[in-house]
Design a protein with these regions (language model features):
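Extended, charged catalytic domains and RNA/DNA-binding interfaces, predominantly
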Residues: 7-297
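Positively charged n-region of N-terminal signal peptides that target proteins for export
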Residues: 1-7
Length: 299
């Protein structure tokens, strides 16, 4: 009997060591994988469909000008919010990389143009390089002289301020060129709270704990939670550029104010357009109005 209990104790101790070791490796992201950019369908919208779209407009208009329909605010699971909502605990459907966005814009929405605008604050060299490659690939699928759809490279400057004077709202940045020689080494993130929160070690550890709980509660889908840990680890391991080092591919450029953002955009080798996102999105808007006694002035 003593031998049995001794053997059982050794076995229990061995299992405990294995479980703890496994948990530790999972906690620090060793079992997670970074999402690739994907591979879009190497085909364009059928010419018959494209010509039908054009003829339908001309049939109802006296002008030879064509109205173009597009989307300037598109996220993939390279954005933290989209990744979070793709998790099994939210009944998400898993990864949706840039290639998926390309295919959806072309074959499902039949858009004339679209802009990939993932949150710059969550960007890393891995994501930015993959995004550029997929934007180029999406455009290569069509005739450059008569494209069925144009894909633009962009990013979202996700700024959050602590007070009215320093809250500027989000801005979607659209870059004209897609050739690497004209592009910045990284998108330009919004400095301050928005950027700091992504790289806060305490926040990352909290995320790791939450994901481990979800992984052990849903073992069949644990890999997706491990991938989210790897996603956050990749962000924290990618430094923010300091001083005049913005043109460094190994760090993330940032701008604290719209003035600084526009200054850095003007220094690029490509033209750009900036479209305000607005201030009406959840915690992104200021919580400075006391709504317990709303008045016309406060609202």
């Amino acid at each position: 009997m003593r031998i049995f209990f001794k053997s059982f104790s050794y076995l229990f101790f061995l299992i405990l060591v294995v479980v703890l070791t496994y948990t530790l490796f999972a906690f620090y992201g060793y079992f997670g994988s970074l999402e690739p950019g994907g591979n879009s369908i190497n085909s364009e919208l059928p010419k018959k469909v494209l010509n039908s779209k054009i003829r339908s407009q001309l049939r109802h208009s006296n002008s030879s000008k064509q109205i173009l329909f597009g989307d300037t605010h598109v996220h993939t699971t390279y954005s933290s919010d989209a990744f979070l909502w793709s998790l099994p605990m939210y009944n998400g459907r898993g990864p949706h990389p840039v290639s998926d966005a390309c295919d959806y814009a072309r074959f499902c929405s039949a858009l004339d143009f679209w802009v990939i605008s993932d949150h710059a604050e969550a960007s890393t060299p891995h994501k930015w390089n993959n995004t550029i490659e997929q934007v180029q690939s999406c455009n290569k699928s069509t005739d450059p002289e008569n494209p069925d759809m144009i894909t633009f490279l962009g990013f979202e400057w996700t700024q959050i301020g602590d007070n009215r004077e320093e809250h500027y709202g989000h801005k979607n940045v659209i870059l004209k060129e897609i050739d690497s020689e004209y592009l910045p080494q990284s998108p330009i993130a919004a400095g301050g709270d928005s950027l700091n929160n992504f790289r806060d070690p305490n926040r990352v550890n909290e995320t790791r704990i939450n994901m481990m709980v979800q992984a052990y509660s849903d073992l069949g889908n644990r890999q997706r939670y491990y991938d989210f840990i790897a996603y956050n680890t990749d962000i924290t391991s990618s430094p923010v550029c300091t001083g005049s080092a913005d043109d460094n591919k190994d760090c993330l450029a940032s701008a604290d104010t719209p003035k600084e953002l526009f200054t850095k955009l003007n220094a690029l080798k490509t033209d750009s357009i900036v479209i305000p996102h607005g201030n009406t999105w959840g915690f992104y808007s200021l919580s400075l109005i006391h709504i317990s006694e709303p008045t016309r002035r406060t609202i």
